[in-house]
Amino acid sequence: RNLAAGKSVLDLCTYTGAFALHAAKCGARDVVGVDSSEDAISVARKNIELNALKNIQFECADVFEFVSRQTQTFDMVFLDPPRFAPSKGSRDKALRAYYKLNLEALSKVSPGGMFITFSCSHQISRNDFQYMLASVFRKAGRDGQILFQGSQPADHPILISCPETQYLKAFFCKVM
């Protein structure tokens, strides 16, 4: 809750704005949410009104293009893209897309800021995602600390007999 207070926040692949709205409600100084879905952004904007928030804006844009042209840096960046690897055959292409998007997103994090990144692709293992993330930090010439690793909550249980139900990876990183 206190992580966002007084901070600038960028929420990439915001969908209906959950992370962005929560950051704004928790006292973020300014919040920008970006998603490529006009329908999702429309819902996110309605959520601003429902929550009577003033320090938040949403933009409908291709996230890859948005981060490549964005010059501002933020104290906290969330990156929660949709599933990039729907099948085993798409794994390598997905890892390249995760790498590219995470590299661009990391460049928008101010020194000392937080980078919170996710993958919801079962085909990408936690080890693969962490290795990709380490490669991103090296390429960017930055260091970081993983403060927390997460998975899906209890309302999305992991079935022992169905390994694809263990799909969500979350890394909360402090950027040096």
Roles of regions detected by a PLM:
Residues 1-175:
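Rossmann-like S-adenosyl-L-methionine
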